[in-house]
């Protein structure tokens, strides 16, 4: 893992903390403060130190700052503009996402990311800088750069070593631009050949193969400092409808889901996945009222309580047709948060982004959401940022030739 992070914060930990966790060697140094991000050189350290830093930071955060951290926002156009600047500087959003509509040439893409970081430089919490870089038809690279094949290619090889090396390559590629989070790999099982949205984005129709290859790609990224977001829980592989356009319905029982769709996600949880993205899909056998991304029965009862996931839950983009055909973005975001989500992904429309922030504030003021519930999610988010030592350091230039040499070596 690379970089400094959460700059400007002095983290205090009293001597008794070290005694309680039984770290006698640390106790001898108890007069010293725990290392800040910039001082740390090792990825692995006591979770108690991460928790202590986050707890200290949260003591000084306002409710507005906490709610800002719950949002990952997108933007219009290919250049940095006033709306994104306002969201970063005034609302202190947790992160940004770049989509295809934002991608230009390599230097332009780098400039956009650097300007986002500059806007956040005076703030104490670094941004998630996120992207969908799966390979195949879901790639956010400039058109001049070589792109990885779709997941289906790796499924045909069955080569877990190649899958891990692909995750490593993705980490190197994304670090080169300054990203720190990738919405990949896809853990959906390709169980419906007529699926209009997943298809070759899935590794296989075999859930165990999806799990094996997906975990290899995930670890290739996380071992090299990129946060991996596995998706689309509880499974998007058997849909007949594209959730970007309308709401898919899957008529499967929980027993049927356990036999296929949930297998890769169960493995991901066992392998300590950091973030799981929840899909916008209706599973009437599980919840006949809300789609999965808004469902307490699916996010809290199934994912959290039954499957014991303790990491960060993020929604799929809340501006997709599956949501906006039936809800406003703010009301859907509030319901998703009540259901158990931590991060709310709103990939576009400045008005919706600001209205969602205001709706969350109003929900707390009305008592619909407690501040304790806000703190729960913010702690998960900040611990993740802390663990990966995120930073807003600028990238001076991109060596495209070096990246392409790595690509050629990977797929030679």
Regions found by a protein language model. Give the residues of each.
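Second-shell residues forming the walls of enzyme active-site clefts
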Residues: 62, 104-121, 125, 137-139, ...
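Preference for extracellular/luminal or secreted protein segments
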Residues: 2, 6, 23-89, 306, ...
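Bacterial N-terminal signal peptides
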Residues: 12-22
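Catalytic domains of carbohydrate-active enzymes, especially glycoside hydrolases
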Residues: 86-99, 169-181
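Hydrophobic faces of well-ordered beta-strands that scaffold small-molecule active sites
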Residues: 68-75, 94-98, 127-133, 181-185, ...
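Second-shell loop/turn segments in exported
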Residues: 39-44, 73-78, 95-104, 151-164, ...
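Active-site-proximal loop/short-helix segments
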Residues: 141-146, 180-200, 231-247, 279
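A substrate-binding/cap region within the structured catalytic cores of diverse enzymes
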Residues: 151-179, 186-214, 218
């Amino acid at each position: 893992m690379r970089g400094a992070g959460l700059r400007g914060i002095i983290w205090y930990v009293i001597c008794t903390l070290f005694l309680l966790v039984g770290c006698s060697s640390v106790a001898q140094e108890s007069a010293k403060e725990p290392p800040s991000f910039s001082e740390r050189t090792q990825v692995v350290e006591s979770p108690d130190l991460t928790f202590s830093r986050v707890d200290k930071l949260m003591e000084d955060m306002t409710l507005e700052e906490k709610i800002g951290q719950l949002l990952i926002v997108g933007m219009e156009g290919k250049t940095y503009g006033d709306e994104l600047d306002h969201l970063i500087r005034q609302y202190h959003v947790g992160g940004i996402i770049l989509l295809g509509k934002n991608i230009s040439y390599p230097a332009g893409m780098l400039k956009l990311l650097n300007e986002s970081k500059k806007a956040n430089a005076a703030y104490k919490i670094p941004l998630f800088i996120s992207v969908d870089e799966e390979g195949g038809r879901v790639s956010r690279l400039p058109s001049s750069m070589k792109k990885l094949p779709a997941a289906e290619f790796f499924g045909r090889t069955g080569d877990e070593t190649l899958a891990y090396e692909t995750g490593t390559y993705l980490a190197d590629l994304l670090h080169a631009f300054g990203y720190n989070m990738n919405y990949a790999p896809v853990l959906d099982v390709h169980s419906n050949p007529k699926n209009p949205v997943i298809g070759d984005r899935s590794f296989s129709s075999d859930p165990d193969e999806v799990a094996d290859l997906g975990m290899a790609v995930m670890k290739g990224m996380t071992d090299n400092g990129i946060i991996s977001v596995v998706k689309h829980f509880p499974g998007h592989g058997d849909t007949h409808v594209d959730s970007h356009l309308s709401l898919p319905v899957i008529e499967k029982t929980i027993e049927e889901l356990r036999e296929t769709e949930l297998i890769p996600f169960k493995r991901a949880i066992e392998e300590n996945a950091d973030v799981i993205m929840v899909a916008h899909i209706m599973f009437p056998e599980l919840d006949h009222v809300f789609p999965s991304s808004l469902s307490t029965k699916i996010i809290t009862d199934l994912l959290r309580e039954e499957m014991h996931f303790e990491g960060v839950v993020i929604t799929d983009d809340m501006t997709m047709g599956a949501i906006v055909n039936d809800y406003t973005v703010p009301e859907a975001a509030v319901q998703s948060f009540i259901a158990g989500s931590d991060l709310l992904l709103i990939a576009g429309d400045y008005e919706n982004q600001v209205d969602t922030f205001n709706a969350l504030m109003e929900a707390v003021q009305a008592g619909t959401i407690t501040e304790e519930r806000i703190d729960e999610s913010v702690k998960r988010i900040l611990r993740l940022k802390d663990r990966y030592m995120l930073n807003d350091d600028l990238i001076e230039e991109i060596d495209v030739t070096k990246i392409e040499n790595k690509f050629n070596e990977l797929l030679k």
